[in-house]
C-alpha cells in the first residue's frame, strides 16, 4: 500500500494533473491528461485514510462529479476517498484508482482531455489485467 507523501501520477508517458492554466472561479477544476512537461507543480499529495486515500493536486482534494474527476477548491468535505489497488502485472508502480461504487479513473484518448470516471474493464485472467488507459503509474517523490 502507499504511504502518505508526495507523488507523481502518470498514464503511460502523460502526466495526470490539474491544468496549468485555469479560470479564477472557485468551481471544481478538471483533472486532465497532460503531455510530459516540467513536473514541479504537478505533484500530488496522497493522504492515507484507513484503507482509502485522499488524492490532493495543487492543494485541492479530488472527487468524481458525475462521470469525470475534479479537484475541489471549496466544499472539500465532498472529496472522494479513493481505493488504490496495485496491478503488479502492469509494472512496479502500476495501480488502478477506484471510488466506493467500484467505478474508477480512465485516461482519455488524448492529452488535454479530462480524466473519466466510469465502470472499469477487467480482463478475465488471474491475476486480472486492465486496459492501459485504466492503469496509472504512481511514483513516490523523495
Swiss-Prot record:
Keywords: Acetylation, Protease inhibitor, Serine protease inhibitor. The modification N-acetylserine is found at residue 1. InterPro entries: Inhibitor_I66. GO terms for molecular function: serine-type endopeptidase inhibitor activity. Inactive at pH 2.0, activity is restored after 10 minutes incubation at pH 8.0. Serine protease inhibitor. Active against beta-trypsin and alpha-chymotrypsin with dissociation constants of 0.35 nM and 40 nM respectively. Inhibits factor XIa, but not other enzymes involved in coagulation and fibrinolysis. Does not inhibit subtilisin, lysyl endopeptidase, arginyl endopeptidase or papain. This is Serine protease inhibitor. It comes from Lentinula edodes.
